Every structure is written in structure tokens, then in C-alpha cells.
């Protein structure tokens, strides 16, 4: 317990991180507190009582979900073996049919195409999805190098995509149910990144669990056969 207490000071809501609701009956925690010098004891007690109001953005959202983290990740965060970091989990896929699966089990991690393999996070990584970016572009041709060099932009010029739907799941559980792609039309919103949809209900994706982001189109009429989609899941992740 003492080694965990020494590693959690950078976080808010550490009571949830450590899996404790209070001091009563927690002899291990009380013993660790007694062994601290008075200044450190006061600082630790203050952190234990914190509601997480100091942190902002995706990090604050992650701290609110500490109680949902697996025990091994909680322990590694407490010991300082894992930290919280900003990230975007991304993937590029061709619009070759009305159903586009942005993360698939046969995918390999490759710079410029995607940064996860097999549609799963690596071991010891938990990821809180705070927002989603969806962009479209037309590659010069269908070779991998040209696809990687595609300039992705707003969906407004791709009406069949705008009028389609998307869903996001993890371990077969809905994070975002079928929702109109119109939410990614942000060209006229000067305070919102291009193609960014902020989730009002952020959700965790756990390590080694299948994640599925599916784009469904009603029609492909008018789309260039070289059209590709870029999706980015923005949020906070645990990392060494």
C-alpha cells in the first residue's frame, strides 16, 4: 500500500484508483499513513479526499473512471509503472462497400495507416474515448503509398458519407449506437477541430478487447472509387 501511495500524488480521485471508499476499517492504509511524515500525510489525505475537479479535459474524464479500471492497471498507475497520456487511436480504410469496418482483426499496425493491431489495445493499456474524428479524402491511386499520402478533409463534400451512420463498440457493448455522420460536419464551427465529435458520455476500452467502429452508407452514388476514410478516437490512455 505504501509504495502505491507514493506513486499516486499526480492524480485526482485516487480513492477510486486505489479501490478505497474511506479510512474506516482499512488497516493497511491507516498503517501506511502513520509511517509518513506529517506533511506528506496531510498531502496524501488531501488527495484521497479530492473529487478530481483540478484536472481538465480528457484526463479529468479518465480520473472519473478510475473505479472501472482493471486491478492490474490500477496497481501499475499507483506504483508509477503506468502513466496517463493523450492519444489518438487512428485507422484509414477504403470506401469499397456500403459497410466500412475501421478496425478489423486482420489489421497490422503500420505508420500512416493505423496505430493498433488486430483491433485491440496492447496489454496494460486502457483507453478512455473522449471524442471521435471522421474525415474523408480521395487517394491519387490505390497503391499503399498514395493512400498514406491522401489529404483528408471535411465530410461536407462527401454527401453519401455525411448521410450515413456510424457506431462504436467494445467487447460487443455499445459506446456509441447508430448515429448520423452529420455530427462530424464541423466546417462552420470555428471552435471545434475539423470532423470532431465530442462524446457527452466517454467510455473505457480495455486492453486485449475487440473494438469495432463501423460506418454504414445508404448509397455510394457519386463517390470516387478511391475514396478513403480516416477515423481517430481521441482520449486518454495508460502507457509506460
Role assignments for model-derived ranges:
Residues 1-240:
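Beta-strand-centric surfaces of beta-sandwich/beta-rich domains
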Amino acid at each position: 500500500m505504501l509504495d502505491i501511495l507514493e506513486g499516486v500524488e499526480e492524480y485526482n480521485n485516487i480513492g477510486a484508483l486505489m479501490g478505497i471508499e474511506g479510512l474506516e476499517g482499512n488497516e493497511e492504509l491507516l498503517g501506511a499513513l502513520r509511517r509518513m511524515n506529517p506533511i506528506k500525510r496531510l498531502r496524501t489525505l488531501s488527495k484521497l479526499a479530492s473529487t478530481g475537479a483540478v484536472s481538465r479535459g480528457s484526463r479529468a474524464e479518465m480520473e472519473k473512471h478510475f473505479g472501472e479500471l482493471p486491478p492490474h492497471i490500477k496497481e501499475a498507475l499507483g506504483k508509477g509503472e503506468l502513466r496517463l497520456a493523450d492519444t489518438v487511436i487512428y485507422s484509414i480504410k477504403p470506401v469499397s462497400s456500403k459497410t466500412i469496418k475501421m478496425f478489423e482483426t486482420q489489421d497490422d499496425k503500420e505508420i500512416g495507416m493505423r496505430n493498433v493491431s488486430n483491433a485491440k489495445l496492447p496489454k496494460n493499456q486502457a483507453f478512455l474515448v473522449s471524442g471521435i474524428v471522421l474525415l474523408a479524402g480521395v487517394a491519387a491511386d490505390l497503391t499503399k503509398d498514395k493512400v498514406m499520402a491522401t489529404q483528408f478533409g471535411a465530410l461536407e463534400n462527401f454527401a453519401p458519407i455525411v448521410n450515413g451512420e456510424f457506431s462504436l463498440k467494445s467487447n460487443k457493448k455499445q459506446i456509441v449506437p447508430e448515429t448520423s455522420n452529420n455530427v462530424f460536419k464541423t466546417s462552420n464551427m470555428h471552435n471545434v477541430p475539423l470532423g470532431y465529435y465530442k462524446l457527452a458520455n466517454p467510455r473505457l476500452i480495455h486492453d486485449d478487447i475487440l473494438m469495432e467502429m463501423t460506418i454504414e452508407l445508404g448509397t455510394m452514388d457519386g463517390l470516387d472509387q478511391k475514396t478513403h476514410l480516416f477515423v481517430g478516437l481521441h482520449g486518454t490512455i495508460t502507457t509506460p
